[in-house]
């Protein structure tokens, strides 16, 4: 559990310049509109950016005042690998909702990419990027 000091969190709706970033997380999931996507599964890439005041964590240099990145990674992994959604929008929304519910922050940005999607041609990825606030 994270200790919250005065001023940490959403700062009363004010701009929070600090960020925690988890970039390029790779998971194997079973999401998609087509049956084959849900049966065979495929690789998904997820980026997460949390906006919160990190001054207490930096000042104390104590994880008790911060967010454990490994726990955050495991939460995202569980959502991507153990649940199934038709759309990347649904997957991104679930990640944002769970992260906002479990951690003290002003907002979260979630990007989900599906590399080499079934598009009938060559393409790097399909993707969505959403930002949600408390």
Give the residues covered by each predicted segment:
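N-terminal, polar/charged subdomain of small-to-medium soluble alpha/beta proteins
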Residues: 2-7, 11-134
